[in-house]
Structure formats: structure tokens, C-alpha cells
A protein has these predicted regions:
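Proline- and acidic/polar-enriched loop/turn elements at helix boundaries
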Residues: 6-7, 205
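Short Gly/Pro-enriched turn/cap motifs at secondary-structure boundaries
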Residues: 8-11, 16
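Glycine- and aromatic-enriched mobile tails/lids
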Residues: 14, 26-44, 48-251
Length: 251
């Protein structure tokens, strides 16, 4: 008898990166003068954060390190800094109001595109142009295609306008986050001219520690991606454990 054929393809289950943090979970905003500049009052842990422990290819089961170790580190650091009776620092109320208004407008705006169609185009573009094996041509084309798809989000609207249990609205917010993440990923992959860890570049098959032993720092503003580098942390906190020297990953 004939059996149905099921396609088997690779897909994403982990992001090799995230919000830059130090080992205490404090969020960093790297600058040219200070690549370890701390954002006061903001912490991140788990798979959303990048504390420079995984390198370019996380080993299996090491997500527990993100969650358990750095989750605990965050709580300990917060308890050290924040004391009972401390006042919350003043914040930019106008910026907060702008963010709230932007998200509210998603409910009311009218458009000619739906979430599912844009999400599918984004998925196809990422699968084709930022898949397991990459090259300059694919990545450059991917940057252009994804930039166009990113702009289409402004034409997306939803039918459900309610404020309670609105799954359409949740999917719309998820799409915005996915587009942000995808655009940064595509630009960052095109930026890195080497092969390292999960980034396998056919035009640059070797690892290049001289030029690319660094994190890629990406800032996204209205669809424009600005990229820079941040040094990889190679120093240990104490003398009990020695730093592991660089070596080729072979099997």
C-alpha cells in the first residue's frame, strides 16, 4: 500500500542571542566607550537574554543554565540593589504613553492584509534565505525581501476589535515581534563574513577569530538595522576554573 509522504525540514527552536546582559542579569546597552554599560533597573534571564555563555551554538540541555543559574543571579542582584522603601526612578512617561497608544492602534486600524499571509511570507523568506546553509547571494536577497515584508506590517489589520481574550490581537503582536527578530537575524547573518557555530556560510567556510570573535550588537529603529560588535567575555570570575582556550569544534 502507498504511504503518505511527510516533508522533514529543519526549523528554529532556539535563538542564539538575545538581550545583552552581564552575569548578574543586568541588561547592557553597549557603546563604543563602554561596551558593558548597564541599563539601570532592567534585568533579563532565560532564553530572552544573552549573557555570553553559549557561544555561537548552544549545547543540548544548556537552556537550563539560562533559566536556573541566571534567573537566580537576577533575583540575588535585585535584592542587593533594591531595598524596602526605595523610590522608583523617574521614567519617560511620554514614551510609555506612546507605546501604549501604538499597541491600542493595532486594534482600530484598517488595512488590506491579514496576519497569516504576512507571517507565511516571512517564514518562507527566512527558510530560503537564512536557513542552515547560507551564502552572500542568498543573504543579500533575503535582506531586501524581508525589508519589504517588514513594511507590509503597516497594512495589517484584524477583524476582532475586542479587548478581552482577543487571540487575533495576540497573533498580531506576535507577528510584529517575529518580524523584528527576523529582520535583525537576516541583517546579522549577512554582516558576519565567516562560519561559526550555527552560522554556516558557504562563501566563508572557516571560522575567523581575528576579525569575528565578537558578538553582533543590533539596534532596530523603524525598520533600520544598525550593527556593531561587542567583545566576547573570555575572563573567568575567579581562579577556581580556568578559561577554556579557543579550539576547532570537531567530531
Amino acid at each position: 500500500c502507498a504511504l503518505p509522504i511527510f516533508p522533514v525540514i529543519p526549523t528554529v527552536h532556539y535563538n542564539m542571542g538575545g538581550i545583552p546582559t552581564n552575569w548578574k542579569g543586568q541588561v547592557l546597552n553597549p557603546t563604543q566607550k563602554d561596551e558593558n554599560k548597564i541599563v539601570n533597573g532592567l534585568w533579563a534571564a532565560g532564553e530572552a537574554a544573552c549573557s555570553s555563555v553559549h557561544g555561537a551554538n548552544r549545547l543540548g540541555a544548556n537552556s537550563l543554565l539560562d533559566i536556573v543559574v541566571f534567573g537566580k543571579a537576577c533575583s540575588e542582584n535585585i535584592s542587593e540593589i533594591c531595598k524596602p522603601g526605595d523610590k522608583i526612578e523617574e521614567c519617560d512617561i511620554q514614551q510609555l504613553n506612546n507605546d501604549i497608544l501604538t499597541n491600542k492602534n493595532y486594534l482600530s486600524r484598517k488595512g488590506d492584509l491579514n496576519v497569516a499571509d504576512i507571517r507565511l511570507e516571512m517564514q518562507k523568506t527566512m527558510q530560503k534565505h537564512a536557513g542552515v546553509f547560507r551564502n552572500d547571494k542568498l543573504l543579500e536577497e533575503g535582506v531586501k525581501k524581508l525589508s519589504e515584508i517588514y513594511k507590509l506590517f503597516d497594512r495589517v489589520s484584524i477583524d476582532d476589535k475586542s479587548n478581552v481574550f482577543n487571540t487575533e490581537y495576540i497573533e498580531m503582536l506576535e507577528l510584529k515581534n517575529l518580524l523584528d527578530n527576523s529582520l535583525i537575524t537576516m541583517h546579522s547573518a549577512n554582516y558576519r563574513k565567516e562560519s561559526r557555530g550555527a552560522h554556516s556560510h558557504q562563501d566563508y567556510p572557516e571560522r575567523d577569530d581575528k576579525n569575528w570573535l565578537s558578538h553582533t550588537i543590533a539596534h532596530l529603529n523603524n525598520g533600520n538595522v544598525i550593527l556593531s560588535k561587542r567583545n566576547v567575555i573570555r575572563k573567568v570570575l575567579d581562579d577556581d576554573v580556568k578559561a577554556i582556550p579557543l579550539a576547532k569544534r570537531v567530531y
